[in-house]
Regions:
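Short "repeat-start/strand-capping" segments in structured domains, especially the N-termini
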Residues: 2-6, 21-25, 40-45, 60-65, ...
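GD-rich hexapeptide-repeat beta-solenoids
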Residues: 9-10, 25, 51, 65, ...
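Short, T/G/N/S-enriched strand-turn elements that build extracellular solenoid repeat scaffolds
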Residues: 1, 14-20, 33-40, 53-60, ...
């Protein structure tokens, strides 16, 4: 639909077509949601469900993008991106596709798995969880290494960070690694405290800033 903001408040939403708005779009669900088509808004896009989200296609917003669910799976070749991007899984977020945005915040209550073809990008990027796995994967004999990269500053708040086999944590600005994301001098989603365990095995942690 076009020409106005749209709100979909429903138990469930299914289909492999396009759900688009040339302004804002808000979708609230209580069951699992599988996005196999395109979910896009020229303005703000809010997608939340008390169930799980499985994205095998495209979720994008021209302005703010907010996605939240119990568990989120962003498959290889799938894309979640906004001008500012906020993604939260109450339990686990698994990414083999692309997550991108200007200022990007990716959080999960328990675990973030960025695997193989998985890329999590942002201008300023904050990643917060209990366990962060940034790991490689071999499919059909081809090994791919995962990447978490910020064009400006990178903040990672996690108790356990596993950066494995040629996978990369990269910041073109400053990099801060702590035990959680918090607020510093009025700025939110900054790494605070200390991570308990950092396993960096044959992998890269690199900052061109501080």
């Amino acid at each position: 639909s076009a020409g106005q903001s749209n709100t979909i408040d429903s138990k469930s939403l299914t289909g492999d077509g396009k759900v688009t708005s040339n302004q804002d779009l808000s979708i609230s669900l209580i069951t699992d949601y599988a996005n196999t088509g395109e979910l896009t808004a020229d303005g703000k896009l809010t997608l939340n469900t008390t169930g799980n989200i499985n994205n095998t296609s495209k979720i994008s917003a021209g302005s703010d993008l907010n996605v939240s669910a119990q568990n989120i799976d962003n498959a290889a070749n799938a894309e979640i991106n906004g001008n500012t991007t906020s993604i939260h899984a109450n339990d686990t977020l698994t990414n083999r596709g692309l997550i991108d945005g200007g200022d990007t915040v990716v959080t999960a209550g328990n675990t973030i798995n960025n695997i193989g073809t998985g890329r999590i990008y942002g201008n300023n990027l904050s990643v917060g969880t209990t366990i962060l796995n940034n790991i490689d994967e071999t499919i059909n004999g081809v090994n791919k290494a995962a990447t978490i990269a910020a064009r400006e500053d990178l903040d990672i708040g996690a108790q356990t960070i596993n950066n494995i086999e040629h996978s990369s944590l990269i910041s073109l600005g400053d990099m801060r690694i702590g035990g959680a994301l918090g607020s510093v001098s009025g700025t939110n989603n900054i790494a605070v405290g200390k991570a308990a365990v950092i396993n960096n095995n044959s992998a890269t942690i690199e900052s061109t800033g501080d």
